[in-house]
């Protein structure tokens, strides 16, 4: 079943539950560990976080921001804005919540890829941490672990730091007030903002949070005004392509936005006016309906690593979800060999424009 996403305007929030104060895994969680769909290559930052917890037990209940499944962490309330990872957490038996509320004796945090997202997460964690509580942050050395450890230690007392797996997990306490200037600066970063010279709202951590993606802008230039009927925007982000389609193509009866990042989808709801529906959804699992036209700027990275298979999965879903005579409109980096994959799916690709960086393709 596809869950239609509705969000309040706080990009990082979830509600507390009662959990045992012991760090040990309960029998229920042991069963969950056996059936966990955790990938073979576990996130090294997650492994380092679990190691830090074994070496430095903390009080519970706990909240896990940026959660991923791990047997030592199944007792934590999980917040995860990315649908594929949220689905893994749910399959492992973790309690998921859309908006964290209340206070937790411990908060665990696996930051995202950007500095702004990480610092915004610091202030969120502070606001959800009970007096005397512990915040543990874990990230890769190449993602700036040492820099962020230094940054947060200026605001709060550093408890410990554990280095392993080319990552670092470090902890601060809430036994005394944090530095107010640092909190104010981080809180400002966490606020929704407008992309310069536009009316589009974004938040830290979403794709293309500081500007309109040039690939999407190029695709928008090639959307024919004759587009009509039911349209899907897969990997819709904060809604730029859907907004362009509704503005340029008056005969669109409805556009459905499918996006894996709940924060981006919340932005899209603010950015669009018109006949649109919004779905927090993993596109690689398929779509619930067929469409006259599908728009996409498919992702080709999983985390920091290039993953052309992800782009292929998007195109496969699109091909299966087109009505007879329907058309796929996409933009991609010019070096990605998508044409052959489209042909293998029974579509006839046509390159409409190719620049030094991008290519726009129509396939039917």
Task: Annotate the PLM regions.
Residues 81, 140, 257-261, 310, ...:
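Short beta->alpha hinge that forms the Motif I/post-I loop of the SAM-binding pocket
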Residues 26, 163-228:
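SAM-dependent Rossmann-like transferase core, predominantly class I methyltransferases
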Residues 119-131, 312-324:
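A short glycine-rich, Lys/Arg-flanked "PGG" loop and its adjoining helix->strand segment in the class I
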Residues 294-319:
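Mobile active-site "lid"/loop adjacent to the S-adenosyl-L-methionine
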Residues 35, 41-92, 214-296, 302:
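Conserved SAM/SAH cofactor-binding pocket of Class I
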Residues 132-141, 325-332:
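Conserved beta-strand signature within the Rossmann-like core of class I S-adenosyl-L-methionine
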Residues 157-193, 333-364:
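Class I S-adenosyl-L-methionine
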Residues 3-9, 17, 22-26, 35-36:
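Low-acidity, Ser/Thr- and Arg-rich intrinsically disordered low-complexity segments
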